[in-house]
Amino acid sequence: MSISPSELGPLFKQHFDGRRFVVVSNREPYEHRWSEEVGEMDVRRPAGGLTSALDPLMQALGGMWVAWGSGEADAAAVDPEGRTRVPPENPSYTLRRVWLTHHDIHRYYLGFSNQFMWPLCHLRPDLTRIRARYWERYRRVNRRFAEAVLEEVRGKEAAIWFQDYHLALAPLFVRARRPDLALAHFWHIPFPPMEIFRLSPQAGYLLRGMLANDLMGFHLPGFADNFLRCARRLAGAEVDFAARTATLDGHTCYVGDFPISIDLDQFRDAATAPGVE
């Protein structure tokens, strides 16, 4: 079954009863860069499946996207609160940028996320590199993302959708301050078997972060099953495999598999564009 962008807005409002919709990811959907003309900026869409898949959704629903401001001119394109409206040709939602330092990028992103989490989840623990400073910075940056989310939903009902392995702890920090919010998380890479994930010294803490969500999503049923087994054995959660739930400290997280889609019309247009054979 497919659904058009024009149908998404009414469907969301029907099921979420007017809650503000907030997407949270490491990668931003639009970057500002300085052009060759002095003082002028260009806007580009970074390559990547996550932003390509979610940008049409956000344009249909509106709301807020919280992400790392990675473009060289990003700071010059936002208001004092770090916000800008996107896309530039038809502003439909607000992008709230989170700023990362040089150490943040090298320890949270290139370090813990990409040198540890990525190979571990792809069944290559032999390629992992772990440093105490990587983990500490990962925690710190996840808390910074959580603080940005909390600022944007202060005094509001909201549905928050976290993305991927960069932000495994952020739901825990948000839940601690706002237990009333609806939290979901989609994991865009494989989730490994327990025998692999337990090799992480921080496995229990990472799982607690993910279990703070109301809904945890994966691409495949096997990834969801791996997560449930890890939740039971490594985090001490009470797991119901038939219902696909994991309960920890009185909070129940539902776990499912939701293969992500693509913008079919966009791919058809690209395939028939001049110069494509």
Give the predicted meaning of each segment.
Residues 1-277:
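Catalytic cores of carbohydrate-active enzymes across secretory and cytosolic contexts
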